Amino acid sequence: MAPAQRPLLPLLLLLLPLRARNEDPARANADRYAVYWNRSNPRFQVSAVGDGGGYTVEVSINDYLDIYCPHYGAPLPPAERMERYILYMVNGEGHASCDHRQRGFKRWECNRPAAPGGPLKFSEKFQLFTPFSLGFEFRPGHEYYYISATPPNLVDRPCLRLKVYVRPTNETLYEAPEPIFTSNSSCSGLGGCHLFLTTVPVLWSLLGS
């Protein structure tokens, strides 16, 4: 009679969350920061191209940034007066010049100003590691930049700019100045690679026993 096979799924479930256990427990209760992305927001009105400043938010790792798009209730204004924006994530030069072509990429689009359920909301989580194959990873002690542009064929609007500073921590020392774009072909940070390399030999030994 063949020996009974050992169930591997419970073991995998025990091994894979190891990295999550190493995260700072003090950040278990993350903060949320709201940004209302419209030109009537006075925080944006101090932002002039070339001044190097503008709307700034300070966050910590595992915090959330909630972007609220422009929204209009009844009676609705004329369509040409409704604000619509395409939001980009850019580098420092793109933020200073309000030019999304400076290593910028489209992040969100505020294209439903009269949505019946309320304003569109987009959320960014500032995390060291992401479980998603197309997620972004952020580093403490660095700044990240967002700007908006008017969609084509619409009335041009002033550029709105946002700078997010991720506060440094005592436990992490990273030098990556830009958000890391992850894919299925790479490990999400050194912790993920180390976990994978240490887990594989254990699984092979169990399969061969």
UniProtKB/Swiss-Prot annotation:
Pfam families: Ephrin
Lipid moiety-binding region (GPI-anchor amidated asparagine): N184
Glycosylated residue positions: N38, N170, N184
Subcellular localization(s) per the UniProt record: Cell membrane
Record propeptide residues: 185-209
Cystines in this chain: C69-C110, C98-C159
Keyword Ubl conjugation among record annotations: no
All copies of domain Ephrin RBD, residue ranges: 30-170
Keywords: Cell membrane, Disulfide bond, Glycoprotein, GPI-anchor, Lipoprotein, Membrane, Signal
Main location: membrane
Entry's Gene Ontology BP terms: axon guidance; bone remodeling; ephrin receptor signaling pathway; olfactory bulb development; osteoclast differentiation
Signal peptide start-end: 1-20
GO molecular function: ephrin receptor binding
Mitochondrion found in the keyword field: no
Tissue specificity: Expressed in myogenic progenitor cells.
Cellular component terms (Gene Ontology): neuromuscular junction; perikaryon; plasma membrane; side of membrane
InterPro entries: Cupredoxin, Ephrin, Ephrin-A_Ecto, Ephrin_CS, Ephrin_RBD
Membrane topology: Lipid-anchor; GPI-anchor
Subunit (UniProt): Binds to the receptor tyrosine kinases EPHA3, EPHA4 and EPHA5. Interacts with EPHA8; activates EPHA8.
Annotated function: Cell surface GPI-bound ligand for Eph receptors, a family of receptor tyrosine kinases which are crucial for migration, repulsion and adhesion during neuronal, vascular and epithelial development. Binds promiscuously Eph receptors residing on adjacent cells, leading to contact-dependent bidirectional signaling into neighboring cells. The signaling pathway downstream of the receptor is referred to as forward signaling while the signaling pathway downstream of the ephrin ligand is referred to as reverse signaling.
Entry similarity comment: Belongs to the ephrin family.
Entry-linked PANTHER family: EPHRIN, EPHRIN-A2
Record protein name field: Ephrin-A2
Species the sequence originates in: Mus musculus
GN (gene name): Efna2
